[in-house]
Design a protein with these regions (language model features):
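Non-catalytic substrate/cofactor recognition surfaces at enzyme active-site rims
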Residues: 1-208
Length: 208
């Protein structure tokens, strides 16, 4: 019977780093291609430095985080109302306020206004587990990498692996500051990414 090392590669979502042939702008298409090639290079470098898992045993934990679906803060509603007013006249006018794409900007701005003040929430499932001396967290949404960097820096494990999905954007405070389209389009309020990061550090400590 042969034995060897099992290598698992988890590729989550962290922004547009794919080689996207559908991007119309040649400048942007080349930029995405460059990012994709760089990321592939980083993966190869990481694979060359693999280490066997130390320690033993498996431990898991799970928690449900209640996220607020409300953007009625910091002048956001006023901005959304401006976008709706502009887009009623010109469907591409959303770009003037940095709302990404004109047509989707109109829809998202209307959605923000509808949700504001309703006190809506959405449950987010959080998982953390340990395999040997490795710590893992798993989340089904696209939490910005700022939060992932914080989790790794504060994790009790020397190596922490974050398995990420793309169910919805959970933008970091920095993304909200520079009006990222993910922040505008995402469902959750500002501060959600940072709260999740803190909670994940707690879960990792629980499985240490």
């Amino acid at each position: 019977m042969q034995t060897g090392m099992l290598c698992a590669y988890f590729n989550g979502a962290s922004g547009n780093q794919n080689q996207d042939s559908e991007v119309k702008s040649e400048k942007h298409r080349l930029m995405y291609n460059e990012y994709g090639v760089k990321m592939a290079g980083y993966v190869v470098e990481t694979l060359a430095d693999l280490k066997e898992i130390g320690g033993s045993g498996i431990k898991t934990t799970h928690e449900t985080f209640v996220g607020n679906v409300d953007h009625s803060w910091d002048g956001f509603i006023t901005q959304a109302e401006e976008v709706v007013a502009l887009c009623e006249k010109d469907k591409t006018a959303g770009k003037q306020l940095g709302y990404g794409y004109g047509f989707s900007s109109h829809l998202h701005a209307k959605s923000i206004i509808t949700r504001a003040g309703l006190g809506l929430t959405k449950n987010l499932e959080m998982y953390a587990f340990r395999i040997g001396d490795l710590g893992f967290i798993s989340e089904s949404y696209e939490m910005f990498s700022d939060a992932g960097i914080y989790i790794r820096a504060n994790s009790p494990f020397e190596t922490t692996i974050i398995i990420s999905g793309n169910h919805d954007y959970i933008a970091s405070a920095e993304a909200f500051d520079y009006r990222s389209y993910e922040a505008d389009c995402g469902m959750f309020e500002r501060g959600t990414a940072e709260k999740l990061a803190e909670k994940y550090v707690e879960l990792l400590k629980a499985v240490q």
